[in-house]
Amino acid sequence: MKTGYCIKTIKYKLRCSHPEWLTETEKYYRQVLDFYFRLLLEHEEIWELNLLQMQGALERLTIAGRDGRVPERPLPFDKVPVYFRRSAINKASASLKSYTEKYKNSGDDLVYTIPDTIDASVTYFKGMYKDFRENKISLKVWDGKKWNWMDCRLKGQSMPEDGMMLSPTVVFREKEFWLHVPVKQQTEDARNAKERMMSRENVCSVQFTNTDIFAMCCVLDGDGKQKAVYSCRGGDAYRSKCKVLLEKIEKSRVYTDKDNAPHANHKYYLRLKNLSEHYAHQVSREIVDFCVREEASVLVFPSYDKEFTKVVRYRSGMYSPLYLGSRIREFLKYKAWSTGIVVLELSAEGTSSKCFVCGGKIKKNGAMFECENGHQGSRFLNSARNLGVKCLKDFERKRKI
């Protein structure tokens, strides 16, 4: 069986004796990054190179060679460690490639503007950190005059035993410093969806709703027979908690609108954000655990056109279970892949208008439905079943072609 890998980011709260040094380091990093970004804009001939080749080209332009080569544009900074410099080069190159790809995909002519500075956090390559443990790390930081090794304390979840740590990033967010550590983990099953369907493995289809049920899940076997059903609940509780916070924001506006505060009601909006992330993580974990229990190796989401999605999200409200569906999808993709489950998106056309049992037209009545032949039940489960069957039929049809 093919194996693959997934990368997830673990976030640690960072505590240290000199937080101002972290600020100075970020400021210095942005200056170096800005220099290389502007240099890149002047040399379009290296834009098509890959990141490693771009790094070599930029270093030849700015760093003196061992053979006595004089650089064309010497780096205008003193005491820039090699891995600090390479981290800045890598981020500048990635920023430019992302920018050019955006225009290339849109078909528009490339018209770039030079930013005053690039809003980037410091990514620490090897050589800039050491002694990483679950509760501490040593970082090389700039105090404005010289480089120092600073011991920092970490608070967060433990590192997976089978995980390989990649280059961490120090991020300043919500008045605190955080260490974002990407972790690479191996997945036991890296087969694509086509290979899994040929093996007639179980499929789990998901229908998101705007009720107490965040998501209705249905597992079908290779023949389309229903094996298990699971509903992820908590939508009403989420909606109620959001409503309480929104009411507090509305009441406080009487006092905050007049004082011109730059971040009025920040603590309430932060709670809303944390609440949304909590439920999105909880529901996505429930769905993945259900798939593992029922041995479903393919997970299917409904896909809608952009205009329909925009209208539905607007009508349901920003803090509704259905609106949270997009965040749940986002978390599901990496959580599912880390356990060897493939995620697919399939057009939802026709899944909510016909009966799963007989294919007849249905009439909706709240959360229930009744078809023209008398079959009735949950309309969300009916949609999930139809989505799963549609997925199986699509792959069956492709095999025959």
Model segments located where?
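A general structural signal for short secondary-structure junctions and capping/turn motifs
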Residues: M1-T3, Y129-K130, T169-F172, K194-M197, ...
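Positively charged, helix-rich recognition surfaces that bind polyanionic ligands
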Residues: L179-I401
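Gly/serine-rich nucleotide phosphate-binding loop at the start of the catalytic core
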Residues: M1-K91, Y112
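A general secondary-structure signal for short beta-strands and their flanking turns/coil
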Residues: T3-T9, E174-E176, E201
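Stable alpha-helical structural segments in soluble proteins, enriched in small hydrophobic residues
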Residues: V32, S87-Y99, L381-C391, F395
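Acidic carboxylate diad motif detector
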Residues: Q55-E176, K184-T187, L322
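Generic detection of short hydrophobic beta-strand segments and adjacent strand-loop junctions
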Residues: G4-C16, K146-L154, Y230-G234
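Generic structural signal for hydrophobic core residues of well-folded globular domains
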Residues: L40, L96-T100, C291
